[in-house]
Amino acid sequence: MVYFENHNKEPDLAEIHYIPHNVEETHWFLDEIEASNFKWAFNVAHGHLVPEGWSGFLDTFGVDKIGQVRVNDNSGEYEIHLIPGEGTIDFPWLFERVESSGYQGWYNLGFGNQTDKIRIRNWFETLITE
């Protein structure tokens, strides 16, 4: 399986500029590549950094091509892998949107240490089952 991630925009003076970082650039790939082993690694925190927000990605692409949801938090200002709840992403709304859209895949926890991941996983489980 190949997982394709929406990235974060780097500052203009950065040495590297990733694509795709917004909805428009993500279309270039998700609309053109039709392969059963090509899935979208939906990075919620990266989506939180663009004007469309992470919900703009879901509004545009839905969940059908998602192979995994990558989860961490940030303030919406710049890329940093905060523990969920330490930034400004609305995780109850995120899980409501993703799960009610029919997503049945897995979530990748990209933050903190093992203890943090277990604690936050337990919190996320309560959000999904409410």
Describe every region a protein language model picked out.
Residues 1-5:
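Glycine/proline-rich, flexible active-site/cofactor-binding loop segments
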Residues 6-17:
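Active-site-proximal beta-alpha loop/turn segments in soluble metabolic enzymes
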Residues 14, 20-130:
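Histidine-acidic metal/acid-base catalytic patches
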